[in-house]
């Protein structure tokens, strides 16, 4: 999922994804995970955890739900971000990394929870330093 909120996998927690909201209607990440496994290649996910321009409460997104209710980042985190990170760390077999991106001013408690989910579900996976608050396994430029 990039900042636009569109998941390039079959997300059960949000319908704005390649299977349910596009004519492609297949899960390319499932196919890629299988192909990487067959060829002995590492596999992982990119996930923009702070920004979501289309989901209420996501950084850069709407501040109200469709029915006009004001929401905070916590709403986005609990209803989209956390469920999707659980999905990508449980539905695709062993993964080698999760590349979080653009933490911005995301509170440390949220980053800690995401890191804990990855560590629990994929204990061998590396986490990018762009998770935020120095909680990743490696640093990257950009």
Question: What is each stretch, according to the model?
Answer:
Residues 1-142:
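Mature catalytic domains of secreted/periplasmic carbohydrate-active enzymes
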